[in-house]
């Protein structure tokens, strides 16, 4: 598999340090608020990576942490009249609920920062002993950035350029404006722990270094997160870990792109902040997961409700094809009509292309393109009145079951019973569009009556009236059926 390594800025062949085993760490949430769709993207991207690596036979140990002590958590605790621990527990619970709905697998190891205070203190002590960090009279501990010559190697930033714009805030006791906090002296009303420098709490960056070192052998095979974490968080992780341990921290760095809303970066200040729960009020969870896979993970993805509608339509087409394929397979008699020679070859090619897309830096967008290619091929067979009855078509439909199982295993979508998904989707669209089903049923009943009376002008007028309500009517041998446009 080729992976784009943010450290080398190029694609590299992925080879685990220990053949057959992968140690992977992804930065998790700071538990102070509901998860937004940026969190959803990171979670889904690395969930697919874990799924795919396991699909290829690798033994993956996956860790994702929780930051449960932080300035934002303390601020939220004061706002809500809760303790920091209560706030963190509340939003860790909502994180799990959201991830379960998005079919994101639980990590094997889910460490919390507050459970690793001793490890963080020990790492600080090691850095101080090496002259890479220093304690201030007030009890803060800072990392000496200039003591690590390779600082900036991940983000590509020049240390002198950073220095020119850096300032020491009033009250700080930094030796250099670039230095960052490893340990923060306690403030009144904040959670704190006893340390060699007095009461205090860890800085954000030291947390992931201490937790990953405790739970996994270093260097990690893969460390992931959003592109916003490259600097300063991941840059600082590298500096403090490698300075303390004198060995590489991570072999492959992977970063997913931003989620934009209407072509602007999502932020609370712009008023375009979308939580997962906001979106799932109007769309099925599988639609959101599918949408997040429609772009390459390193590219930005633009969230709009139009793009969600398009993702919903695409997913609906796939499930409709799977439903039709299942219906056709129930046929009792099959003909000996041969399929064109290239059909089976095309089926095989699309299957291989799906895997090749994921081998190429986890290109889920291309992989989904090959899923659609497979569905188009199946639809082409089922639309041909002769080929749909062929025993060779039956053999391909039976193989389709295996492909769908693989798609589900790797991408985490297409795994529901088609009829159940389509029924839930219809109900979801009815709610989202505020459709009055009582009125729809009454119009359909009237249309049935006027058609029986051969008043086709009125029947067509009712069809148009239903279309204006967002309803599509199809006449079948067993009667009219309707769906939401």
Curated annotation (Swiss-Prot):
Motif ('HIGH' region): 29-39
InterPro entries linked to this entry: Cys-tRNA-ligase, Cys-tRNA-synt_Ia_DALR, Cys-tRNA/MSH_ligase, CysS_C, Rossmann-like_a/b/a_fold, tRNA-synt_1_cat_dom, tRNAsynth_Ia_anticodon-bd
PANTHER family the UniProt entry points to: CYSTEINE--TRNA LIGASE, CYTOPLASMIC, CYSTEINYL-TRNA SYNTHETASE
Amino-acid positions noted as binding Zn(2+) in the UniProt annotation, renumbered to this chain: 27, 208, 233, 237
Short motif ('KMSKS' region): ranges: 265-269
UniProt protein name: Cysteine--tRNA ligase
Cofactor(s), by name: Zn(2+)
Keywords: Aminoacyl-tRNA synthetase, ATP-binding, Cytoplasm, Ligase, Metal-binding, Nucleotide-binding, Protein biosynthesis, Zinc
One annotated GO biological process: cysteinyl-tRNA aminoacylation
Subcellular localization(s) per the UniProt record: Cytoplasm
A cellular-component GO term for this protein: cytosol
EC number assigned by the record: 6.1.1.16
Cofactor: how and how many bound: Binds 1 zinc ion per subunit.
Catalyzed reactions: tRNA(Cys) + L-cysteine + ATP = L-cysteinyl-tRNA(Cys) + AMP + diphosphate
């Amino acid at each position: 598999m080729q992976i784009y390594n943010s450290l080398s800025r190029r694609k590299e062949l992925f080879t685990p340090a220990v053949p057959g085993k992968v140690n992977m760490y992804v930065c998790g949430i700071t538990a102070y608020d509901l998860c937004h769709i940026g969190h959803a993207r990171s979670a889904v991207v690395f969930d697919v990576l874990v799924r795919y690596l396991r699909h290829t036979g690798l033994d993956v140990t996956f860790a994702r942490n929780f930051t449960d002590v932080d300035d934002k958590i303390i601020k939220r605790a004061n706002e809500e009249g809760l303790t920091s621990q209560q706030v963190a527990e509340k939003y860790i619970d909502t994180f799990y609920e959201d991830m379960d709905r998005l079919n994101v697998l639980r990590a094997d190891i889910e460490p919390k920062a507050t459970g690793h205070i001793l490890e963080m203190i020990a790492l600080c002590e090691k850095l101080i002993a090496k002259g890479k960090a220093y304690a201030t009279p007030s009890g803060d501990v800072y990392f000496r950035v200039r003591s690590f010559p390779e600082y900036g190697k991940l983000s590509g930033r020049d240390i002198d350029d950073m220095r020119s714009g850096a300032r020491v805030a009033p009250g700080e006791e930094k030796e250099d404006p670039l230095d960052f906090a490893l340990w923060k002296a306690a403030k009144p009303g904040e959670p704190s722990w006893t340390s060699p420098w007095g009461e205090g709490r860890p800085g954000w960056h030291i947390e992931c270094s201490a937790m990953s070192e405790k739970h996994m052998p270093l260097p990690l095979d893969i460390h992931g997160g959003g592109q916003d974490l490259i600097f300063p968080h991941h840059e600082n992780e590298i500096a403090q870990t490698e300075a303390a341990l004198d060995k590489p921290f991570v072999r492959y760095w992977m970063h997913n792109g931003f989620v934009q809303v209407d072509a602007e970066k999502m932020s609370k200040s712009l008023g375009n902040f979308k939580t997962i729960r906001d979106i799932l009020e109007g769309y099925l969870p599988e639609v959101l997961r599918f949408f997040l896979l429609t772009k390459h993970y390193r590219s930005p993805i633009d969230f709009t409700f139009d793009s969600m509608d398009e993702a919903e339509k695409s997913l609906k087409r796939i499930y409709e094809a799977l439903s039709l394929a299942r219906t056709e397979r129930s046929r009792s008699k099959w003909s000996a009509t041969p399929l064109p020679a290239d059909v089976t070859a095309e089926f095989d090619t699309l299957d291989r292309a799906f895997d090749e897309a994921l081998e190429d830096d986890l290109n889920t967008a291309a992989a989904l393109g090959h899923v659609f290619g497979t569905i188009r091929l199946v639809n082409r067979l089922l639309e041909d009145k002769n080929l749909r009855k062929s025993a060779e078509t039956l053999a391909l439909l039976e193989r389709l079951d295996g492909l769908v199982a693989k798609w589900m295993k790797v991408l985490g979508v297409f795994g529901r019973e088609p009829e159940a998904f389509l029924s839930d989707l219809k109900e979801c669209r009815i709610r989202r569009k505020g459709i009055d089903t009582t009125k729809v049923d009454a119009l359909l009943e009237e249309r049935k009556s006027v058609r029986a009376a051969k008043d086709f002008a009125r029947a067509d007028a009712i069809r148009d009236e239903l279309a204006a309500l967002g309803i599509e009517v199809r006449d079948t041998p067993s009667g009219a059926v309707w769906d939401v446009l």
